[in-house]
Amino acid sequence: MRDVALVLSSGGARGLAHIGAIEELEAQGYRIRSIVGCSMGAIIGGMYAAGKLAEYKEWMQTIDKKKILSLLDITFSLDHLVKGEKIIEAMKDIVPDVKIEDLPIPFKAVATDWEKGQEVVFSKGSLYEAIRASISMPLFFDPVKKGGTTFVDGGILNPLPLNISKDMPGDIVVAVNVSGTGEDNENDNENDNENDNEKRKTKTKTKTKSKAQTALDFLSSLLPDEPDVNYFTMSQRLFRLMVQKNAALNIELYKPDILVNIPMDLFGPFEYDHVDKISTYGRKKMREALKNIDN
């Protein structure tokens, strides 16, 4: 049994792939000794460190498009569209808050100090305060203000915090990056059917927008300009490109022992109603990565 220091990237709903990656690690006898996560990686990592990943996944399996919208406390402020508190409170109903230092597995979450332009690592205090700071995507979530500091999404500076893992317990570093470059084909996923694949391909190619799709589609539909060029969709695209480049740089600087790289454009950042599809894909990619190491 090998001990793992696990690093989980930011990436919105794409981060649901982290669930399957963890499941495959455990299935193959790896023991996760520590976790550091950013944004969605902080959510999944925190749930696992609390021993509640299965409960979190079960809850996510109840999420549909209507429920996504019900969890978004939308407010058209100058610096954000969603307050973010309803999501956290809903998660607390499934997994109660706990102090990070009391978790059975060492855990750290990464956020960004907006004024200083520095990464901030949460290693103690409220688990949900750390998660809320780490997921505060600019222009989408209300920034977190605490102790005179304004916290925003850790993905701005450090979407794949490999540098933090060097001080965490574990014999090998395993990283899951859901903002990878390149292309992949969902037809490789044995649990997908042809109709699902064709629908996703069409959606990706045409970037069709409608209120019935995702929260991003809904928010975009409220803006007056063309959906592909309004300020919100453009800012999110810029943010995603920045995250992708920073993650690639971290991989180059701090090479993990095992890397799972999932192309950014394979899943949308707001497809939270596809937990089974995305987590299954993450499990498949982890299986492939472990097979390559074993060989």
Residue spans for each PLM region:
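Helix-rich "cap/lid" substructures immediately adjacent to catalytic or cofactor-binding pockets
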Residues: 1-35
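A short alpha-helix-loop-beta-strand transition element characteristic
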Residues: 68, 95-106
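ATP/pyrophosphate-binding catalytic subdomain of soluble kinases
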Residues: 125-126, 132-170
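Non-catalytic peripheral regions of patatin-like phospholipases
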Residues: 4, 53-90, 112-114, 118-124, ...
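Conserved small-residue
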Residues: 11, 21, 41, 109, ...
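Catalytic nucleophile loop
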Residues: 18, 32-49, 158
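Short beta-strand scaffold segments in enzyme catalytic cores
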Residues: 107-113, 142
